[in-house]
Amino acid sequence: MALKHFLNTQDWTCSELNALLTQARAFKHNKLGNALKGKSIALVFFNPSMRTRSSFELGAFQLGGHAIVLQPGKDAWPIEFDTGTVMEAETEEHICEVARVLGHYVDLIGVRAFPKFLDWTYDRQDIVLNSFAKYSPVPVINMETITHPCQELAHIMALQEHFGTTDLRGKKYVLTWTYHPKPLNTAVANSALTIATRLGMDVTLLCPTPDYVLDERYIDWARQNIADTGSTFQVSHDIDNAYRGADVIYAKSWGALPFFGNWAMEKPIRDQYRHFIVDEAKMALTNNAVFSHCLPLRRNVKATDAVMDGSNCIAIHEAGNRLHVQKAIMAALASQ
């Protein structure tokens, strides 16, 4: 049987994803367990983290396991990922050794590695994550690269709790771009689009212009998913029409893909769309929609204080669910 990783939810069946969510709910009610007793996980961070690191470390501990944190280039050697390269630069060891050696020590490996933001053609290959999965003899978990599947499941769990049902089919779901002074990763948006269409919601991707539409891979996944579920998917640049009648507003900022490596040119374009902020007037157009965001969030830039502090905001609950879904993921993979 092939080794199963958790790289993207699109790689898992709906029944497998539902089983993870069921287990996450069980862990939420019973915090401690022994599903990882005698097991260990290496958490490899190429980029900073607050929620991801704390929730993975605590999750492993609560299930009787042990987590170690490695930061290549800081407290561990810089790693080379190119094949066939003559390693005369700054990197000290190659991923083909790193992943294999870690696999001798631990039972799971988590990887967090953001895009370099210089060339999307390169970044979309997700080389760091896929290299770990290629060479590792143990399961690999995506802790955010160009997708963020752990956030996906925490998001869906929070929506299910809010609506009081595991069946989200037919909900009008708006994934809206929001302004940020910096160009950000598309990972959460890619994942939100994937899971919302996968679970049968009617999805609108709202963004300022065609330049801000997500990568064709995730658009294709969305179209494949709605073909399977009978739901709908559309791209919109009209704020009022997108918000009108929505049941879910999920906000995220990201940089325009055509401008990767040329952000100075993209900045004045992005600055024109500060009005995409999620505010009370836009939320008033919805069907009393629930609002969420993956966090961190710049208040009164991405969303107003009133929206963030309102009773329909579930961002904190979503973040809290990261602990439970990641415990479910670790437990499932460690049992192989």
From Swiss-Prot:
GO terms for molecular function: amino acid binding; N-acetylornithine carbamoyltransferase activity; ornithine carbamoyltransferase activity. Its EC number is 2.1.3.9. Its main location: cytoplasm. The modification N6-carboxylysine is found at K302. N(2)-acetyl-L-ornithine binds at E144, K252, L295. It catalyses: N(2)-acetyl-L-ornithine + carbamoyl phosphate = N(2)-acetyl-L-citrulline + phosphate + H(+). Carbamoyl phosphate binds at S49, M50, R51, T52, W77, R112, H148, P149, C150, Q151, C294, L295, R322. One of its GO terms (biological process) is L-arginine biosynthetic process. Carboxylation at Lys-302 increases the catalytic activity of the enzyme. It is an enzyme of class 2 (transferase). The record marks E92 as: Key residue in conferring substrate specificity for N-acetyl-L-ornithine versus N-succinyl-L-ornithine. Pathway: Amino-acid biosynthesis; L-arginine biosynthesis. Keywords: Amino-acid biosynthesis, Arginine biosynthesis, Cytoplasm, Transferase. Catalyzes the transfer of the carbamoyl group from carbamoyl phosphate to the delta-amino group of N(2)-acetyl-L-ornithine to produce N(2)-acetyl-L-citrulline. This is a step in an alternative arginine biosynthesis pathway. The enzyme has no activity with ornithine. NCBIfam families: PRK04523.1 (NF003384). HAMAP family: AOTCase. Belongs to the aspartate/ornithine carbamoyltransferase superfamily. AOTCase family. Homotrimer. This is N-acetylornithine carbamoyltransferase.
